[in-house]
Amino acid sequence: PLDTADVIYVNAGVTHVVDAWLDGLADGGRLIVPLTTDSNTRSLSSMQLSGLYFKIERRGSQFDARALLPTAIIAAEAMRDPVAEAALAAAFSKGGWNQVTRLVRGTSVPDEQCWLRGDGWSLTGPATSTPAAVPPDP
């Protein structure tokens, strides 16, 4: 477990948010995390969105979220999951990342509000199309 922190900055591209990061945030604390696919390191000439920095801010037991800016950054090889990466690539392709307003833990988010569904978490906003989903661990 992490000590409680006001800021956690992830300095390499990952495919998913980790519970320990969320658990380690103090109330009002911020997590800055680049969610990326592997295409950001394959070709600099590609114009397809392949990574975004997100700011996740703890508000008691809730988490505000918003996309900050596109990124192409070195990947954290140990923090990559092929299924999560495919869901993230699908979410980038469908757009709507600029409407993300919350990170919700658990699986209770209706599909129409979910931009990206991870294993035990979702990035959500106003009603969107069907989410890109990461299936739960077996």
Predicted regions, residues:
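A short acidic, Gly/Pro-enriched loop at the edge of an enzyme's catalytic core
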Residues: 1-8, 15-16
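Short glycine-rich, flexible loops that bind phosphorylated cofactors or substrates
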Residues: 16-17, 40
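Helix-to-beta-strand junctions that scaffold the AdoMet/dcAdoMet cofactor pocket
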Residues: 25-26
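Glycine-centered, small-residue-biased loops immediately flanking beta-strands
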Residues: 29
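SAM/dcSAM-binding transferase cores
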Residues: 39-138
